[in-house]
């Protein structure tokens, strides 16, 4: 079985965390690919990784691409570092960036010298789910920083980037709240 079966439902976007009675694997089986706007079904995930634009890319990954396109950021030949390897943002975003001829590096908690990797980027995307982990020493002047993180510290929303520290140095940065995450 799949849902929705009613024609009145156009698309499905799943919010996490899931209720305990519903597993990620089961959800992937239930959602029809033509309704799966966040690309959690195996069919749409495979399309993203194959560069097939007939499915849906995950919303947040697509939002990052739309943002960069809106500001006419040419990705061709640019070094893009993505900090985060989730199946919902990091990995699919890497595939979308590759489709625009960027040179992509994915960093994660086990990446050695992560600060150096990030500092070498033309475009840095933070989507690790770790509050304010990206500090000024991760960045360089002229860099574009896209903060996808949504975290709460002492009841206040913040991103994966230490905005106050980093915004003084980089060419452009997205805020949290008010950004793409």
What annotation goes with each model-predicted range?
Residues 1-8:
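Short, small-residue-biased leader/transition segments that mark boundaries at the very start
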Residues 6, 122, 147:
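Acidic active-site catalytic centers that drive phospho-/nucleotidyl reactions
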Residues 10-14, 126, 146-147:
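Redox-cofactor binding/interface segments in oxidoreductases and associated redox assembly factors
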Residues 13-75, 79:
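Anion-binding alpha/beta catalytic cores of soluble intermediary-metabolism enzymes, centered on
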Residues 15, 83, 176:
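Conserved residues at the C-terminal ends of beta-strands
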Residues 15-21, 129-132, 150-152, 179:
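Short glycine-rich anion-binding loops that position phosphate/pyrophosphate groups of nucleotides
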Residues 23-46, 146-180:
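Rossmann-fold NAD(P)-binding glycine/threonine-rich loop
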Residues 46, 54-144, 153-167:
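Glycine-rich phosphate/diphosphate-binding loop of Rossmann-like nucleotide-binding domains
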């Amino acid at each position: 079985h799949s849902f929705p079966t009613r024609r009145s439902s156009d698309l499905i976007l799943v919010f996490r965390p899931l209720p305990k009675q519903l597993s990620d694997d089961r959800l992937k089986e239930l959602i029809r690919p033509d309704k799966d706007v966040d690309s959690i079904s195996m069919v749409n995930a495979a399309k993203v990784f194959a560069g097939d634009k007939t499915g849906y890319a995950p919303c947040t990954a697509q939002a990052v691409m739309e943002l960069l396109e809106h500001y006419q950021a040419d990705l061709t030949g640019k070094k893009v570092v993505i900090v985060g390897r989730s199946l919902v943002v990091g990995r699919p975003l890497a595939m979308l960036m590759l489709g625009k001829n960027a040179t992509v590096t994915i960093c994660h908690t086990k990446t050695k010298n992560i600060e150096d990797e990030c500092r070498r980027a033309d475009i840095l995307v933070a989507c690790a789910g770790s509050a304010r982990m990206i500090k000024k020493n991760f960045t360089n002047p002229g860099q574009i920083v896209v903060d996808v993180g949504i975290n709460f510290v002492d009841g206040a929303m913040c991103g994966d980037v230490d905005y106050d520290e980093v915004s003084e140095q980089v060419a452009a940065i997205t805020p949290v709240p008010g950004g793409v995450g």
